[in-house]
Design a protein with these regions (language model features):
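Metallocofactor- and cofactor-centric catalytic cores in central/energy metabolism, strongly enriched
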Residues: 1-52, 66, 76-79, 87, ...
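General beta-strand structural signal in soluble alpha/beta enzymes
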Residues: 9-12, 34-39, 56-59, 85-89, ...
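Alpha-helical scaffold elements adjacent to nucleotide-binding pockets in ATP/GTP-utilizing enzyme cores
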Residues: 23-26, 68-72, 126, 148-152
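Conserved mixed alpha/beta catalytic, RNA-binding, or beta-rich assembly cores of soluble enzyme
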Residues: 34-40, 90-94, 111-112, 140, ...
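Internal helical hairpin/lid segments
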Residues: 146-234
């Protein structure tokens, strides 16, 4: 973002994510060319209007956002927009859940309903059958979430495996086939690095060689430097609680996050700090 003729575009919640040296927000404060956008069409229009600038999109997410980025590449290709590139960190859940199943310290899984809308329930059903772990796809309203949690706790307490789709009003067995077909037209699977887990085979999504013009070097990404004492990796794996981290509520806060778990309002550390504070420290 400090390179002349380049501008980094990201969704607003990405700006505060700690980077190897600084966050995008901090880079912008120091004079880097960084901006946020609300939808991908904004980025496409900016690239069309400012042809002398290379726009690098921070394309981050899981199965839910991968179709969006596939559409961006499709539109850029059809509209002959050559000054727009994606720096991707797109990952898929089933492979990683499989990795977690082998870790041995997790008894059951509340599966992501929004991801299952795209992938379909069958991916999680297969995982449950393979590893003998109870898995429940839950919805996002209070009643659906509580129902899914209750079902999962009951299964764990009984020592049972099994799979349940408690979000059947939205999640089908096959998922959104057309959306995933679009992803497959522009992207391919590959190994990906996960914080706390290391490299997980075939859990990443990368642009195909045919569309390398739109790739800003995604396959060469390495894991960010993790500050000494940061417990984000273990928190994500369920091995530590946020309050086990020496940075929690002190040097790591929502306004100045040290680790990824404090960045989003949905992050474990941010939720615990908001709901429970730091009175026990």
């Amino acid at each position: 973002s400090f390179r002349g003729g380049h501008r980094v575009l990201a969704f607003g919640d990405m700006l505060a994510v700690p980077g190897t040296e600084m966050s995008l927000a901090e880079a912008r404060d120091r004079g880097a060319s960084v901006d946020f956008f609300y939808n991908p069409e904004d980025a496409l229009k900016k690239a069309e209007e400012e042809k002398e600038t290379i726009f690098v999109l921070a394309a981050v997410g899981f199965e839910t956002t991968a179709p969006v980025w596939a559409t961006v590449v499709k539109e850029a290709d059809e509209r002959h927009i050559s000054n727009l590139k994606l720096l991707t960190a797109l990952k898929t859940m089933p492979e990683t859940l499989g990795e977690l199943c082998t870790a041995g310290n997790i008894d059951g899984f509340l599966c992501p309903g929004h991801v299952a809308v795209i992938t379909g329930a069958e991916r999680y059903r297969a995982l449950s059958e393979t590893y003998g772990k109870p898995m429940v796809i839950g919805g996002f309203t209070a009643d659906l979430l509580l129902s899914a949690v209750a079902r999962l706790v009951l299964a764990v307490n009984k020592g049972q495996g099994g799979f349940w789709n408690d979000y059947g009003s939205v999640v089908t067995e096959k998922g959104n086939v057309k959306a995933w077909e679009r992803v497959g037209a522009f992207f391919e699977k590959g190994d990906a690095l996960w914080r706390g887990l290391g490299v997980v085979k075939n859990s990443g999504v990368y642009l195909k060689e045919k569309y390398h013009l739109y790739d800003a070097g995604s396959r060469g990404l390495v894991e960010d430097h993790i500050p000494a004492g940061c417990r984000c990796g273990n928190i994500l794996l369920g091995k530590n609680m946020p309050k086990d981290c020496p940075h929690f509520g002190r040097t790591c806060t929502p306004s100045h996050p040290v680790g990824a778990c404090m960045v989003s309002s949905e992050g474990a550390c941010c939720i615990i700090l908001r709901e429970e504070g730091v009175e026990e420290l």
